[in-house]
A protein has these predicted regions:
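Ubiquitin-like/PB1-type beta-grasp interaction modules and other compact soluble beta-rich domains
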Residues: 2-12, 17-140
Length: 140
């Protein structure tokens, strides 16, 4: 009898654990299908801390990045969060967090903002300071 009770309680515990884990799963769909991160994530070690919110298709994820790098582009490249091509005006960002926005391919681009205001420089030229908040938004 004790053995049956032990097995039953073990099975019930496993079922409850599986149910809790399943409820916390975020599905990769649409633009987020190839995303590296689906949940807010903290990365790096360094003196400065900046937040970078990535927005695409009504979904977003925020990266809290600790870094000693001088520019946002360097900090994002250090963690593999952005990729693109060097052009006449600096880095042309095409991929953020694994999400593609290539104007020549799909008509989308990455808008770059600081505290809700569009930046007049690219990520590779944006000097960073502790406590700043940036947004990279997939726009058409």
């Amino acid at each position: 009898m004790k053995k049956i009770l032990s097995v039953t309680s073990l099975l019930l515990t496993l079922v409850m654990l599986f149910a809790l884990v399943s409820c916390n799963t975020v599905e990769k769909t649409g633009a987020w299908e190839n995303a590296t991160y689906l949940k807010d994530t903290e990365l790096g070690k360094g003196e400065k801390t900046v937040e970078v919110e990535v927005v695409a298709e009504e979904q977003s994820v925020t990266f809290t990045i600790h870094t000693d790098k001088a520019t946002l582009g360097e900090a994002l490249l250090e963690h593999g969060l952005i990729a693109g091509e060097d052009g006449p005006f600096g880095l042309y960002v095409k991929t953020v967090n694994g999400i593609l926005a290539d104007y020549d391919v799909d008509g989308y681009y990455w808008g770059f903002y600081k505290n809700g205001e569009m930046m007049m420089v690219g990520v590779d030229s944006a000097a960073i300071a502790d406590g700043e908040h940036y947004e990279l938004k997939r726009e058409k």
